[in-house]
Amino acid sequence: MINNLDIKPDIKLSVKQTFGIDSDLEIEAFSKKNEYVPEIDKNYIFDKDTTLAILSGFSFNKRVLVQGYHGTGKSTHIEQVAARQNWPCIRINLDSHVSRIDLIGKDAISIKDGKQITEFKEGILPWSIQNPVALVFDEYDAGRPDVMFVIQRVLEADGSFTLLDKNKVIKQNKYFRLFATSNTIGLGDTTGLYHGTQQINQGQMDRWNIAVSYTHLTLPTKRIV
């Protein structure tokens, strides 16, 4: 992920025709696919409420958190919506090994003009912010506290991100989108099912514009299974 993506939405799609939802809405989409666009699962069945919440994120630049039990397909739901819009989508699993450095970047040794130098290499977060990319944080409620505070800085739509290591202020790309999935809704594990999840700072939870619960398979999906 070195080069920025010089693309922007250039077509409109019908929500009814694309997702099978009874709605007259039209959404922006990209006419061409690139390497960051997920593959389309033609047999995927969309849950109406979850789909409309995700589409609100894409259409109106809202931060959307999808909560639900394991195995319900929360992340896949976001990916399949993105796939039909040809919207580049990148998933990051916030397990306990993902650190602040992984997201922001770090100093690395490189060769320039035949000489070995040390320079700062931006991480996945600065790159995503500067591009028309849908960034999805999986297992959002399992993230480390230092990582969560980094994420909090980009939860505001159109908010700037400061790279202190480079004395650089990054403005969000007009088509950067942010999503997350979680098993809990920020209150920690009250059931004993999800050991390792954390209570999330309420100030951060309030920055999510939309939280939708996706906890069960729809009836048509159950029939297929």
Predicted regions and their residues:
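AAA+ P-loop NTPase catalytic core and its hallmark functional loops
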Residues: I2-L217
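Single conserved hydrophobic/aromatic residue that forms the stacking wall/gate
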Residues: H216-V225
